[in-house]
Amino acid sequence: MTDVPVRIVTAPAVVRDRATWLAYFHIGLFGYFLYAFGPSIALLRDERGYTRTVASLHGSAMALGAVVVGFLAVHVVRRTGRGPFLRMGSVTLAAGLLLYTGFSSLWVTLLGAFVASGGGTMIMVGVNAFLPDHHGPAGPRAMSEAHGLGATMGLLGPLAVGLGVAIGWGWRVGLLATIVGLVVLEIARGRNTEQFDGPHGHPDDEPGHAPHGPLPRRFWLAMAVFGVCAGTEFCLTLWGSDLLRDRAGLGASAAAASLVTLVGGMAVGRVAGAPLVSRFDPDHVLAATMGLTVVGFTIAWLSAAPGPMLVGFAVIGLGLGLQSPLAIGRAVIAAEGQADRGAGLTSVAAGLASGIAPFVLAAVADHLGVHTAFLIVPALMVAGILLVRAAPVPVTDAVGDAVPTDAVPD
């Protein structure tokens, strides 16, 4: 038998110019907001006396915002250009945070979650289109760096929320810090935003890929895989602190801050997992990370003390770290020539999954307890493994030629 050599090709280096650093920081601010928002829901529930089901409606409102923007983004970018679209994302996210933190009415805080999520999704869609457009063959590595920074800055979110509660300033201060960062970013960006448009992001240009036409069946299965990954991540970021309070007896501020173990694991997973993606089939790596998430969940779920539970959360984070970048990358590849449309639809998948999965978990928790409700996590991961095995996606570039495996988003 003849051994088949494994070809490993080094991807082009990323030229980190000013626009790239601003895009990285934009993703970082979104990561900070996202991981600070999760523990804030449990604290808002305590403050207002909501049930878990009612409080989880804020996650559903966020999901709806992501779905709406996911459908409309490509049309807005074609009219305004990508640079103005990114600035609109900053303004929209800031407005949503002011609504969410500045009012006590349930309907207004739900509206704030919807608007903030819409703004955050605009940032994600804009940056995820800009980096590959701007960097060409080095785009996947730029994407990996951007999302790695998002997870790293996300570490600060739960800590800021927990610290605010601990020192008596309240949980809102940690979230409002996002607005300060957005203001600094937009001042640094300046008035000229054309550098963010690129060849396919200017309103006068034709779109880079056809916006219509049937997408292959494999794309929809790949999008379902991403939905499973997103649903799992949101279940843990939105309600993980509640599980720590229920099982480990942590206080509100300590539980919120302890989510840093989950987010930290995700950041480490994205950095440490990159060599694996360059040496093994990305589908195999993705399935393995789902298995690792189940292992971490088992450690946390069977424990009733802070130490082992936090170890379990860190292992869960290691598994989750690579899942979203890999799942997004394989969905875009599976779109076969409609990459822009495929990227936009992944935001829809994320919105649907992040709205449905945490809501189901919260509803079950109100009736059976949060510990039992969290069994949704291994169920989602097993479903994800089966989907990856059922519909593998070869590593190809936009025109269908084989590319090095280390050119997949890591």
Question: Where are the language model's segments positioned?
Answer:
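Structural signature of the two symmetry-related core transmembrane helices
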Residues: 84-98, 284-299
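Helix-loop-helix hairpin linking two adjacent transmembrane segments in secondary transporters
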Residues: 137-138, 145-197
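Extracytoplasmic gate region of multi-pass secondary transporters
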Residues: 37-38, 216-268
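Helix-to-loop junctions at the C-terminal end of transmembrane segments
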Residues: 69-82, 269-282, 365-366
